[in-house]
Swiss-Prot record:
It is a single-pass membrane protein. It comes from Bos taurus. This is Transmembrane protein 183. Residues 97-127 are annotated as: Disordered. The chain crosses the membrane at residues 300-320. It is found in: Membrane. GO terms for cellular component: membrane; SCF ubiquitin ligase complex. Keywords: Membrane, Transmembrane, Transmembrane helix. Belongs to the TMEM183 family. It comes from the Eukaryota.
């Protein structure tokens, strides 16, 4: 018995094939530009209803591209808020490939132009740019430089620095500031300045006698008890001597002198190589007292001092004496320098205690009261 078409043989309606789990549908930019942007694509949508509460990157890029084609601007020039706000409106222009290609060509041309400009700039830097003036011109300009501006002048160029190394530069500087009424030691007088040996050091010392701005610096320096010198740390004691001072007091005072050599800045930075003067001017720049200073402590009576020459100065303290009228100075010397926050024990090293102390003074090598070296 033939059966007619029943409900089991009835044709089924066309079903839509669902994507497999774990795979995403391909995003087409034209879908976003045709008004298919939902509320779920925005950051202020309810995260309980929508899985993601942020704008999809593909949607944002497509909307910005469409706004760019409408406004004739680059995507980087359109704020993201304005681009997304305009995405909700229907797009009248769907095919804007011609305008996009033209804008891409203009962007490409600007990129090539910037690359050419940067290449030319690099060639100018690598090439010999600027003018190189003769040494005589720099020597002439150096005649108008103030003593406190010598460092800035020498940093202009190599020729300017070379001029500051010459004997002519330091001789002219001395003559420019010398006056007949200047009270100078014998080594700093004009007849002794004809020697090239240690000429630079002698001129600098003489400026602290004759040049008013330099002399004012010395008078403005505070007393040692008010500012404990920390620059002497890890300095090496080169020499020590004492002498009796006979003054207005009935009992004489004693002056203890410690000559230190400070740690070189190049050694601190572990950079041994530095800018050295030309060979023909080495005698002019010779200075036996370079980086040296003198610590002078005057006491009311004689105090026995142990041998500390050749040792490293690690600690300097000033406190009130037991009589509450004078100062008490404590010096600590070690066989090796102390680095970082390393702490010393009280029994380590050699301690020198001076009490009672009348005065404490610290002189750099250019100070007028600093004793001259016999080799200068």
């Amino acid at each position: 018995m033939a059966r007619g078409p029943g409900p089991l043989t009835r044709p089924r309606p066309d079903t839509v094939a669902m994507p497999k789990r774990g795979k995403r549908l391909k995003f087409r930019a034209q879908d976003a530009c045709s008004g298919r942007v939902t509320v779920a694509d925005y950051a202020n949508s309810d995260p309980a209803v929508v899985r993601s509460g942020r704008v999809k990157k593909a949607v944002a890029n497509a909307v910005q591209q469409e706004v760019k084609s409408l406004c004739g601007l680059e995507a980087s020039q359109v704020p993201a808020v304005e681009a997304l706000s305009g995405a909700g409106e229907p797009c009248d222009i769907i095919d804007s490939s011609g305008e996009t290609d033209a804008q891409e060509e203009s962007i490409h041309e600007r990129t090539i132009s910037r690359k050419k400009k940067s290449k030319r700039h690099r060639e100018d830097l690598n090439g010999t740019g600027g003018e190189e003036y003769p040494m005589d011109i720099w020597l002439l300009l150096a005649s108008y430089i103030r003593p406190e501006d010598i460092v800035n002048f020498s940093l202009i160029c190599k020729n300017a620095w070379t001029v500051t190394c010459t004997a002519a530069f330091w001789t002219r500087l001395y003559r420019r500031h010398y006056t007949l009424d200047a009270s100078l030691p014998l080594r700093l007088r004009p007849e002794s300045m004809e020697k090239l040996h240690c000429l630079r050091a002698c001129v600098i010392r003489s400026l602290y006698h004759m040049y008013e701005p330099f002399a004012a610096r010395i008078s403005k320096n505070p007393a040692i008890p008010e500012s404990t010198p920390s620059t002497l740390k890890n300095s090496k004691c080169l020499l020590f001597w004492c002498r009796k001072i006979v003054g207005n007091r009935q009992e004489p005072m004693w002056e203890f002198n410690f000559k230190f050599k400070k740690q070189s800045p190049r050694l601190k930075s572990k950079c041994m190589g530095g800018l050295q003067p030309p060979i023909q001017y080495e005698d002019v720049h010779t200075n036996p007292d370079q980086d040296c200073c003198l610590l002078q402590v005057t006491t009311l009576n004689f105090i026995f001092i142990p041998i500390v020459m050749g040792m490293i100065f690690t600690l300097f303290t000033i406190s009130v004496s037991t009589d509450m009228r004078h100062h008490r100075v404590r010096l600590v010397f070690q066989d090796y320098p102390v680095h970082g926050g390393q702490k010393l024990r009280s029994e380590q090293g050699v301690q020198v205690i001076l009490d009672p102390v009348h005065s404490v003074r610290l002189f750099d090598w250019w100070h007028p009261q600093y004793p001259f070296s016999l080799r200068a």
